[in-house]
């Protein structure tokens, strides 16, 4: 049973992780893991064309998870990085960037669940 107790940092990335962890919240399970999430997101330009317009980006998301249960307290840090090219169509670019963020949150969630399973 995983319960998110605190969210700090980037709201969107935290909500994506929280949404992924909801499927692991079952009040019938005996073990309760309380999770505090702190996230930071950094998007930067990797390359530019001759006009100075960014053509390649790198997005880096760092999560700091503090996990508490009746036996122990543990801190887990997960950093995910993804490089991608710019898209001319602004709407398509925003959609693509949101998909990238969702994928990063999915990977980080899976890594967190894997770490929690080892605690049990």
Predicted regions and their residues:
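Surface-exposed short loop/turn segments
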Residues: 19, 23-24, 28-77, 81-102, ...
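Short, low-complexity, Pro/Ser/Thr/Gly-rich segments in the mature regions of secreted, periplasmic
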Residues: 108-119
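A structural "domain/chain start" motif
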Residues: 1-30, 119
């Amino acid at each position: 049973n995983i319960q998110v107790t605190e969210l700090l940092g980037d709201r969107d990335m935290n909500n994506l992780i929280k949404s992924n962890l909801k499927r692991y919240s079952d009040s019938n399970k005996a073990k309760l893991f309380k999770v505090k999430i702190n996230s930071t997101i950094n998007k930067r330009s990797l390359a530019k064309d001759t006009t100075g317009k960014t053509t390649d980006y790198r997005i880096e998301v760092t999560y700091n998870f503090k996990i508490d249960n009746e036996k122990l307290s543990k801190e887990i840090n997960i950093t995910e990085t993804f490089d991608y090219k710019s898209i001319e169509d602004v709407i398509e670019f925003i959609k693509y960037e949101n998909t990238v963020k969702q994928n990063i949150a999915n990977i980080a969630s899976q890594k967190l669940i894997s770490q929690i399973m080892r605690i049990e």
